[in-house]
Regions:
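Small-residue-biased structural context
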Residues: 1-188
Length: 188
């Protein structure tokens, strides 16, 4: 069964746009929590946020953007989103290379938060509305996204109480699930 948010619920996902929007809200909450965190909470909170952001970007790149590119026929918009993801990966690597006692740690997390916030605004204001009107089977795509995300969360140990065991991997190397084609129904 596909989870509705990054591991905290087992609700079924309504559609791809809803799933990604929920991820965006969760990431915003994590960045806000970082800003209010105690010194002891900074490292684990930043690590969890980076892991979830990597997973979110990966499912968008593997499944969502290919469908969005075909549906919108707007290569420039998707190319820009992918460039922003590449920049975010560099910012994530910078955060992950530091600990909270590093002088630039909070600034690096703040830069990542600003970058992610700008990207989210762009997706939610331009890309998501276009996909809603493009005739894409967003429910089937949402199921594919949720299944892939769940696999990645499990691989990183983010569904378990022990996050740090398998979670030290920087990149998850599993074959991507195939995104449903436009109009294709996904079997149960």
């Amino acid at each position: 069964m596909a989870r509705a948010d990054a591991g905290e619920s087992t609700d079924l996902v309504a559609d791809a746009v809803d799933l990604l929007t929920r991820d965006h809200r969760l990431l915003e909450e994590l960045f806000a929590a970082f800003a209010a965190a105690t010194p002891q909470q900074l490292d684990p909170l930043a690590r969890r946020t980076c892991k979830l952001l990597r997973i979110h970007a990966q499912i968008e790149e593997e499944l969502f953007y290919p469908v969005a590119r075909r549906a919108t026929q707007d290569d420039a918009m998707i190319d820009e989103a992918e460039r922003e993801h590449a920049e975010a990966r560099q910012a994530i690597a910078r955060v992950e290379s530091m600990t909270s006692d590093h002088a630039g740690f909070k600034s690096a997390v703040g830069d990542l938060a600003a970058m992610a916030t700008a990207h989210v605004r762009e997706e939610e204001s331009r890309l998501f509305p276009r996909l809603r009107n493009a005739g894409v089977n967003l429910v089937a795509l949402g199921v594919a996204l949720a299944e892939r995300r769940d696999t990645l969360l499990d691989t990183l140990g983010l569904h378990s109480d022990d996050e740090e065991g398998a979670a030290n991997q920087r990149e998850v190397q599993q074959p991507p699930a195939r995104a449903p084609q436009e109009g294709e129904q996904r079997g149960a």
